[in-house]
Curated annotation (Swiss-Prot):
A lipid is attached at residues 566, 569 (S-palmitoyl cysteine). Its main location: virion. Homotrimer of disulfide-linked HA1-HA2. Residues 555-570 are cytoplasmic. Keywords: Clathrin- and caveolin-independent endocytosis of virus by host, Clathrin-mediated endocytosis of virus by host, Disulfide bond, Fusion of virus membrane with host endosomal membrane, Fusion of virus membrane with host membrane, Glycoprotein, Hemagglutinin, Host cell membrane, Host membrane, Host-virus interaction, Lipoprotein, Membrane, Palmitate, Signal, Transmembrane, Transmembrane helix, Viral attachment to host cell, Viral envelope protein, Viral penetration into host cytoplasm, Virion, Virus endocytosis by host, Virus entry into host cell. This is Hemagglutinin. The gene is HA. One of its GO terms (molecular function) is host cell surface receptor binding. Glycans are attached at residues 46, 249, 335, 431, 503. Gene3D superfamilies: 3.90.20.10, 3.90.209.20.
Length: 570
């Protein structure tokens, strides 16, 4: 009887259990670790870096209309010191300021200079228009050794107005200019602070001096402040420059009686450009859209860790040096331990090892797809990729990097820290704000990447489960799940049959009769095995009862013959 059961079991396993199909996914020996919302250091098959760290130490200017100001400061192009003579009018979409550049020749400063610098950096160049001012009763040829060309001279775009004679009376004057253009006009004027009261009297006559400037949106009065100051460029006097943007059809009026540096031409901005302060060398052989003091950032990544003050079409600056974006599924590498386990399970259960939960059969040999099948049948073993599920996952993952870029990229403008004393508080606020923005975006970047990584892993898990469900619905009662990502098929399934399962063309009705018969045989094996266990337990109980009965009979005979005595004490 037992021999018949054993033969039936062997026959069932040889005929039925020999055919099996399993589902798995691509794996690599060394994956890449990424962070998700719920876990850090999850290993995935593929990932891409989102933080750019490579810098090009040159200003890439190919395809751009570039102007290198050299020794000329950007603000100097509006007033015309000697070093800026060739840049009084220009057109550019990339403006390079150098550290050696200077805005002035006679010592002084611009009021609100950083705002003006910001405007000019975006300007695309400057064109000029004569304001048409004429003067009588004064000299218009004031000059200084601080602004030398071939000899002493002055700012090319300004007029230094002086009394006709030393210590002579400077008449009260009023001059107006109307902007007839369609774009705003940049108007710049200066106030001269003499090195002493005596010098001011010599240049402009005696008495208090007052300059008043007004338009529809601006009104300000200025009084010069003569007095000794440290000499710069051989001068103890100072010229402070002021400016306004005059709207179309608006008029600016100047009223003055000395110490006035008059504008000669109005400036008009040409278009749009990028301006950068850098001493990096220009390179016409490379293209760039993002610049900083150290060169060019050329990258399609959403973030960068090179310079927090880069300008142009730049990746967002973040503090992290690396943020890996998952572009593949969770990796289950076939390491040595896994291979030993697989070898052990092959001995115990065939071709495929055990898994738990999500189908984590990682196959390093599956190189032409993300998801696939392994099978064994009478014709041997085989592996094949499933292109449809692979493409479905890839389609949903493709574009993740582009979506991150869309969320983060914007045109950045540079605000420098070259603030005068009055502007230092504003500068501190700007610096604090910039640092706060970096902190926020560093957190946002980490969060965005973690969200995308979580979605990618969940997505690839979902595609794996969809594939598993597709196979399960096809096989129905013709196969049994083993709980390890595999199906044991209850009929002979050759390579064509396996291919039909993979292609979703499997006809379960065709094999239903054979599968039911084989399933009944397997159930019979299980049932016979159950009866065998009952018989074993019954035999054990009967043996115990027989042993106890024999022992009692022997004891009774011994007591009867007097060979054994039983004494009961109370």
């Amino acid at each position: 009887m037992n021999t018949q059961i054993l033969i039936l079991a062997i026959s069932a396993f040889l005929c039925v259990r020999a055919d099996k199909i399993c589902l798995g996914h691509h794996a690599v020996s060394n994956g890449i670790k990424v962070d998700t919302l719920t876990e850090k250091g999850i290993e995935v098959v593929n990932a891409t870096e989102t933080v750019e760290q490579k810098n090009i130490p040159k200003i890439c200017s190919k395809g751009k209309q570039t102007i290198d100001l050299g020794q000329c400061g950007l603000l100097g192009t509006t007033i015309g010191p000697p070093q800026c003579d060739q840049f009084l009018e220009f057109s550019a979409n990339l403006i390079i300021e150098r550290r050696e550049g200077d805005d002035i020749c006679y010592p002084g400063k611009f009021d609100n200079e950083e705002t003006l610098r910001k405007i000019l950096r975006k300007s695309g160049g400057i064109k000029k228009e004569n304001m048409g001012f004429t003067y009588t009763g004064v000299r218009t040829n004031g000059e200084t050794s601080a602004c030398r060309r071939s000899r002493s001279s002055f700012y090319a775009e300004m007029k230094w107005l002086l009394s006709n004679t030393d210590n002579g009376v400077f008449p009260q004057m009023t001059k107006s200019y109307k902007n007839t253009k369609r774009e705003p006009a940049l108007i710049i004027w200066g106030i001269h602070h003499s090195g002493s009261t005596a010098e001011q009297t010599r240049l402009y006559g005696s008495g208090n001096k007052l300059i008043t400037v007004w338009s529809s949106k601006y009104q300000q009065s200025f009084a010069p402040n003569p007095g000794p100051r440290p000499q710069i460029n051989g001068q103890s006097g100072r010229i402070d420059f002021y400016w306004l943007m005059l709207d179309p059809n608006d008029t600016v009026t100047f009223s003055f009686n000395g110490a006035f540096i008059a504008p000669d031409r109005a400036s008009f901005l040409r278009g749009k450009s990028l301006g950068i302060q850098s001493d990096a060398q220009l390179d016409n052989n490379c293209e760039g859209e993002c610049y900083h003091i150290g060169g060019t950032i050329i990258s399609n990544l959403p973030f960068q860790n090179i310079n927090s003050r880069a300008i142009g079409k730049c990746p967002r600056y973040v503090k992290q040096k690396s943020l890996m974006l998952a572009t593949g599924m969770k990796n289950v590498p076939e390491n040595s331990t896994h291979k030993q386990l697989t070898h052990h399970m092959r001995k115990k259960r065939g071709l495929f090892g055990a898994i738990a939960g999500f189908i984590e059969n990682g196959w390093e040999g599956l190189i032409d797809g993300w998801y696939g099948y392994r099978h064994q049948n009478a014709q041997g073993e085989g592996t094949a990729a499933d292109y449809k599920s692979t493409q479905s996952a890839i389609n949903q993952i493709t574009g993740k990097l582009n979506r991150l870029i869309e969320k983060t990229n914007q045109q950045f403008e540079l605000i420098d820290n070259e603030f005068n004393e009055i502007e230092k508080q504003i500068g501190n606020v700007i610096n604090w704000t910039r640092d706060s923005i970096i902190e926020v975006w560093s957190y946002n970047a980490e969060f965005l990447v973690a969200v995308e990584n979580q979605h990618t892993i969940d997505l690839t898990d979902s595609e794996m489960n969809k594939l598993y469900e597709k196979v399960r619905r096809q096989l129905r009662e013709n196969a049994e799940e083993d709980g390890n990502g595999c199906f044991e098929i209850f009929h002979q399934c050759d390579n064509d049959c396996m291919a039909s399962i993979r292609n979703n063309t499997y006809d379960h009705k065709k094999y239903r009769k054979e599968a039911i018969q084989n399933r009944i045989q397997i159930d019979a094996v299980k049932l016979s095995s159950g009866y065998k266990d009952i018989i074993l337990w019954f035999s054990f109980g009967a043996s115990c009862f027989l042993f106890l009965a024999i022992a009692m009979v022997l004891a009774f005979i011994c007591i009867k013959n007097g060979n054994m005595r039983c004494t009961i004490c109370i």
